[in-house]
């Protein structure tokens, strides 16, 4: 069972429950050698740091003394680990040696027998440089083994959860097919396999595309494991693309070669021995100087170096979790991807997939938008803004430029004549910023350095396309000046209230429909904060309809506002339909759980304001969705939406 607690980009801070044991994602599974004598780092330390580990059932199966202990005492006793144990099936050995001495059903039976929490099918790992015919043939065999494994588990009543590995080599359409076919089977976790050769060759662009083409066709309610990814420099990008689990033998393998892991690369201990101290504060690096560690006996040096590598690995996972909570995962990704040019290729290629990525990125975040480089232009916040500009119902448009020194929000720093013209400011990062919505996230909540000329020109094509699309409504400067001069001479009673006009446009941008018609615009009133002077509420007959949330200026509905949205928005827009059995809980303002969701607006994005209705479209409650439209229909565990209030009968 998997649920999402927090999110940013496509990264998910979640919880997996397996056999009553919980794993917080994203996380790393240290690779544990099934032979305790060959394990580099003590299991006492592993037990303190890890919620889940991965070991090899094939080595256990083919080593008589290990097999005997595992079959009599269980895998947890064999490796001395109390929490979740995942096992590989021999697929790695198959990829290296071309053959294994075990059948697909034998290894499933064995994994169940030794008490594995999560087993793995014996798939056919297909490297990146094989022919398409070979990749297709291997994939067909993997599908057969997968189907047989699921059938075996069901027929035998096995309790172990199963990994269903996604294959397809470098052929993206085969990765899509693999994800689609495997996704329809009842697997618990979906590893993306055979990417280690790509990572070893620094082919990170291909790694990113393999992940995304797999994710697009996998069920959203199951965790995704990037098999063989153990270097911390790759974690941030991989999490941002939707990977939840990683496994690392790198902490031990690198140590054996004298390699010292960092979050943004690898150093060699022999090259560090003349440094006064390590660039790390873990226990090992605090107790030893580089020279002291380098001069230790080889076995002890390897053990301590592996402990450092493991510490750095978990530290990066913790850093990513915090970034998800704070809403600045993209900034961390951009920082990490500048640690190697090939990794930057991986970041750049994802702009091709922004339509898919945007669907998973929250509409608002705790942190502002920080521009860290040209790649920031392709972030989902900007992509979404450009898409949602078309939600605004324009009558007259004036497009203008402002000085680079003009502070944001523009509307508070420009002498703009209040009128019914939508004034749009050309913006180097966001393309066009309508003054009436420019306090909304992320248009005002951003920090951008001085840009190079080529960066300033990035949005020229977008602005030209917008102007062409709305050519009939765009006023030139002479017409605009004439119009506002004429408008300014109107009687006060004939003028539109600029605050109400502004809120109307903000509602269009946020909800995609005209919420305030002409009749309502004459009745509603705005209320400004006594402290800041900014608009804080929209009221109808002294009753609050909407509150402008301080951190992002989103319009948050009160009860009457929810009723207004329900009236103005056509079904199923901004709705979640729930089962009749939980109607009373919704009316009482209790959270909506995923298993009770029957239908929804498929275009919902994470953290949007939503209306909770029954199958007759009767408004029951209102709140915030944690999941997007697709996830709402696929998740069957955890909270789907938190509620702000309910409507009593």
Swiss-Prot record:
Pathway stated in the Swiss-Prot or TrEMBL entry = tRNA modification; archaeosine-tRNA biosynthesis
Annotated active site residues, numbered on this chain, are 88 (nucleophile)
Q: What molecular function terms (GO) are annotated for this protein?
A: pentosyltransferase activity; RNA binding; zinc ion binding
Q: Which InterPro entries match?
A: ArchSynthase1/Queuine_TRR (IPR050076), ArcTGT_C1_sf (IPR038370), PUA (IPR002478), PUA-like_sf (IPR015947), PUA_sf (IPR036974), TGT-like_sf (IPR036511), TGT_C2 (IPR029402), TGT_C2_sf (IPR038250)
Name any cofactors this protein relies on: Zn(2+)
Give me the comment on cofactor binding: Binds 1 zinc ion per subunit.
One cellular-component annotation, GO: cytoplasm
Write down the chemical reaction(s) this protein catalyses: guanosine(15) in tRNA + 7-cyano-7-deazaguanine = 7-cyano-7-carbaguanosine(15) in tRNA + guanine
An example GO BP is: tRNA wobble guanine modification
Q: Which domain of life is it from?
A: Archaea
In the Enzyme Commission scheme, what number(s) does this protein have?
2.4.2.48
Tell me which residues make up the PUA domain. 573-648
Family designation: Belongs to the archaeosine tRNA-ribosyltransferase family.
**Annotated residues for binding of Zn(2+):** 280, 282, 285
Starting at the broadest rank, the lineage of the source organism is:
Archaea, Methanobacteriati, Methanobacteriota, Methanomada group, Methanococci
Summarize where substrate binds, as residue positions: 123, 194
A Pfam family found in this protein is TGT_C2
Name the enzyme group at the top EC level: transferase
The record ties this protein, via NCBIfam families, to: arcsn_tRNA_tgt, tgt_general
Known function: Exchanges the guanine residue with 7-cyano-7-deazaguanine (preQ0) at position 15 in the dihydrouridine loop (D-loop) of archaeal tRNAs.
Q: What is this protein called?
A: tRNA-guanine(15) transglycosylase
């Amino acid at each position: 069972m998997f649920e999402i607690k927090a999110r940013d980009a496509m990264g998910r801070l979640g919880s997996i429950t397996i056999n009553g044991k919980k794993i917080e994602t994203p996380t790393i599974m240290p690779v544990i050698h099934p032979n305790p004598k060959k394990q580099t780092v003590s299991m006492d330390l592993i037990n303190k740091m890890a919620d889940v580990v991965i070991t090899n059932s094939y080595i256990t199966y083919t080593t008589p003394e290990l097999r005997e202990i595992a079959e009599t005492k269980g895998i947890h006793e064999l490796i001395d680990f109390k929490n979740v144990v995942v096992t590989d099936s021999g697929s790695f050995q198959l990829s290296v040696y071309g053959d294994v001495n075990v059948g697909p059903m034998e290894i499933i039976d064995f994994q169940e027998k030794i008490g594995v929490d999560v087993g793995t099918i014996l798939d056919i790992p297909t490297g990146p440089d094989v022919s398409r015919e070979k990749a297709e043939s291997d994939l067909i065999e993997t599908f057969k083994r997968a189907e047989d494994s699921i059938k075996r588990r069901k027929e035998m009543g096995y309790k172990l959860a199963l990994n269903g590995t996604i294959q397809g080599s470098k052929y993206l359409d085969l990765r899509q097919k693999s994800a689609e076919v495997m996704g329809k089977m009842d697997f618990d976790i979906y590893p993306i396999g055979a990417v280690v050769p790509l990572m070893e060759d620094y082919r990170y662009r291909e790694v990113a595309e393999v992940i995304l083409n797999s994710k697009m066709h996998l069920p959203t309610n199951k965790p995704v494991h990037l098999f063989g990814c153990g270097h911390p420099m790759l974690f941030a990008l991989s999490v941002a693309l939707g990977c939840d689990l990683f496994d690392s033998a790198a902490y031990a393998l690198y140590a054996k070669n004298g390699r010292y892991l960092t979050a943004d690369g690898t150093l060699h201990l022999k090259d560090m021995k003349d440094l006064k101290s390590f660039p790390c504060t873990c226990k090992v690096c605090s107790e030893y100087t580089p020279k002291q560690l380098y001069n230790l006996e080889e076995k002890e040096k390897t053990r301590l170096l592996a402990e450092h590598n493991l510490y750095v690995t978990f530290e990066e996972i913790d850093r990513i979790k915090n970034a998800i909570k704070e809403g600045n995962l993209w900034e961390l990704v951009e920082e990490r991807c500048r640690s190697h040019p090939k990794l930057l290729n991986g970041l750049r290629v994802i702009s091709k997939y922004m339509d898919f990525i945007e669907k998973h990125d929250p509409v608002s975040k705790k942190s502002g938008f920080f521009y860290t480089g040209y790649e920031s232009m392709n972030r989902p916040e900007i992509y979404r803004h450009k898409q949602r500009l078309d939600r605004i119902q324009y009558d007259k448009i004036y497009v203008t430029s402002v000085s680079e020194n003009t502070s944001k929000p523009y509307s508070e720093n420009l002498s703009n004549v209040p009128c019914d013209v939508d004034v749009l400011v050309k913006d180097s990062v966001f393309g066009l910023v309508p003054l009436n919505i420019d306090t909304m996230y992320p248009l005002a909540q951003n920090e951008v350095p001085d840009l190079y000329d080529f960066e300033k020109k990035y949005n020229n094509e977008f602005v030209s396309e917008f102007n062409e699309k709305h050519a009939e409504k765009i006023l030139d400067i002479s017409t605009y000046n004439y119009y506002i001069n004429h408008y300014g001479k109107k009687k006060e009673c004939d003028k539109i209230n600029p605050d109400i006009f502004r809120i109307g446009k903000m509602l269009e941008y946020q909800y995609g429909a005209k919420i305030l018609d002409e009749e309502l615009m004459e009745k509603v009133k705005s209320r400004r904060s006594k402290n800041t002077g900014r608009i804080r509420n929209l009221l109808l007959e002294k009753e609050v309809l909407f509150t402008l949330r301080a951190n992002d200026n989103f319009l948050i509905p009160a009860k009457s506002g929810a009723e207004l949205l329900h009236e103005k928005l056509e079904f199923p827009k901004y709705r979640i339909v729930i089962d009749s059995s939980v109607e009373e809980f919704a009316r009482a303002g209790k959270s909506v759980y995923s298993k009770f969701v029957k239908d929804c607006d498929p275009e919902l994005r994470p953290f949007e304001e939503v209306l909770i209705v029954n199958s007759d479209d009767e408004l029951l409650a209102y709140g915030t969705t944690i999941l997007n439209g697709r996830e709402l229909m696929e998740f069957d565990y955890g909270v789907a939406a938190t509620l702000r209030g309910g409507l009593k009968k």
